[in-house]
Amino acid sequence: MTDAAREAARVLAGATTHAKNRGLEAIAAALVERADQILAANAEDMARGRAEQMSDGLLDRLALTKDRLRSIADAVLEIVALPDPVGQVVRGSRTDIGLRVTQERVPLGVIGIIYEARPNVTIDAASLAIKAGNAVILRGGSAAQASNRVLIEVCRDALTSVGLPADAIQSVDEWGRAGARAMMRARGAIDALIPRGGAGLINAIVEESRVPVIETGTGNCHLYVDASADLEAAEAIIMNAKTQRVGVCNAAETLLVHTDVAQRFLVAAITRLTTAGVTIHADEVTRAIVDGQPSIDADMIVPATETDWE
């Protein structure tokens, strides 16, 4: 597998921007054209998830619909529109003898990505790797195995249709945890490993991997409301950031408010958040502000702990 990925990486490293973009456009089109096949596989994952009593948030991350597939396809086309990073000059200088020295961006080679059970990440990861001229080996969450299998098949077929190597996108999902362990030990075969998920997953990979790791964040997205902010707009932003899709990793998790507007803003914002079913982990100042407010369900307010800020 890694030998095939290495050969595919060599091809992609020399591919033109036009060729790579054609591959991405083919992937975007195939996601829409083969939606029924993808959704049938996703239905298998969803049924298994419900049988295993997955939480509503995790099920929402796992779920695909035709609208979500169109959004994923649109995201691929947004990557097409991005400038090609390969060959970009980062910096340069001229030596005393007139020699021009430049630092340019080049593909890494073969990238391994280990991530949670979100099918859209399969497409995001594959598309970004292709755009940057890399081959990618994927290990998605087991809950999305059926969805990922079909999505990777769709991507590989799309690349083949425009003359790019299918082995630029591969998966070790069928090997389960053994596949993830093999990726972590593939020093020299995989050039960089990127974990995406919770702190436990990321820390385990950072500690155990023999392959260089690009460490990502674990979430805890912040929103800050300054004293000069438009409070109505801020309220709308926090509602969208938290309640649009509560289960995704970029949903807002920490709200910081300037003391000058805390009294006015927090009562209104927390009223809307708790009404929408959001439990508030409040510090002492916030609890003092909202305590006894008739518009706020007291059962939805719990004391914040140190771990809430991590």
Task: List PLM regions with ranges.
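Short internal beta-strands
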Residues: 137-143, 255-258, 280-285
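NAD(P)-dependent aldehyde/semialdehyde dehydrogenase
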Residues: 88, 260-310
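Residue-level signal for inorganic ion chemistry
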Residues: 16, 20, 133, 193, ...
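Rossmann-like NAD(P) dinucleotide-binding subdomain of oxidoreductase/dehydrogenase enzymes
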Residues: 81, 90-232
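Flexible, glycine/charged-enriched surface loops at secondary-structure junctions
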Residues: 15-22, 86, 162-169, 244-251, ...
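Short beta-strand-to-turn element immediately C-terminal to the catalytic PLP-Schiff-base lysine
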Residues: 224-227, 256-259, 290
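N-terminal Rossmann-like NAD(P)+-binding subdomain of aldehyde/semialdehyde dehydrogenases
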Residues: 1-100
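Active-site PLP-lysine loop of aminotransferase-like
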Residues: 217, 238-256
